[in-house]
Design a protein with these regions (language model features):
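Substrate-binding/catalytic cleft of secreted carbohydrate-active enzymes
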Residues: 17, 27-181
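N-terminal carbohydrate-binding accessory modules
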Residues: 1-22, 41, 125-127
Length: 181
């Protein structure tokens, strides 16, 4: 908590994990960031579960497609053997694929990354576009709803409505995609 960025040493990593656990959490989602291998080492040793998330490109273009695929491959090659990592997240809230709802090429890119992660590591779950506008290859239907009103939970009682209509702030699945679960 002292640096907000790269921990200065292993003790800082252990302290961060200990603080997370003391707050009652057993896992973290590392948002848009590949952690240093030492973080995963200590998460393994201390029993902290981790969602490994790829960083997103700012724009969707050929360079982003190539870089995303390479980063996914390198991340898995480097860190697949860490038992603390339980889920891979190739995209978050349509960052870098801002038109994934209706753009077929962005949907195919998200599918490609998800399939690549599944092929390289069939032992872990993949949350294709965590939060909204997911493609059907996702293993998790993650919904990010930032509303604070308690009654907003009522909207989630009807599963068909959740997966087929607009939730806050976006659709749960991209056009032409649906829950396979």
């Amino acid at each position: 908590p002292d640096t907000l960025l790269t921990p200065p040493d292993d003790e800082a990593i252990r302290r961060d994990i200990r603080l997370v656990q003391e707050m009652g959490f057993n896992g973290v989602r590392k948002h848009q960031k590949l952690e240093a291998p030492r973080f995963y080492y200590w998460a393994d040793r201390m029993g902290l579960l981790v969602w490994g998330e790829l960083p997103s490109a700012y724009l969707f273009n050929d360079r982003a497609i190539r870089a995303g695929s390479e980063v996914a491959f390198d991340f898995l090659e480097r860190d697949y053997n860490h038992p603390s990592i339980i889920t891979w997240v190739p995209a978050n809230e349509s960052w870098g694929i801002s038109n994934v709802r209706s753009d077929r090429s962005q949907q195919e890119y998200c599918r490609m990354l998800t399939s690549q992660l599944h092929a390289l590591d069939p032992t872990r779950l993949v949350s294709a576009n965590d939060g909204w506008e997911q493609v059907e290859q996702t293993d998790l239907c993650a919904i990010h709803d930032y509303s604070l009103a308690p009654e907003s939970c009522d909207a989630y009682e009807d599963w068909d409505a959740v997966t087929k209509t607009q939730m806050r702030p976006r659709l749960v699945f991209a056009d032409g995609n649906s829950w396979r679960g």
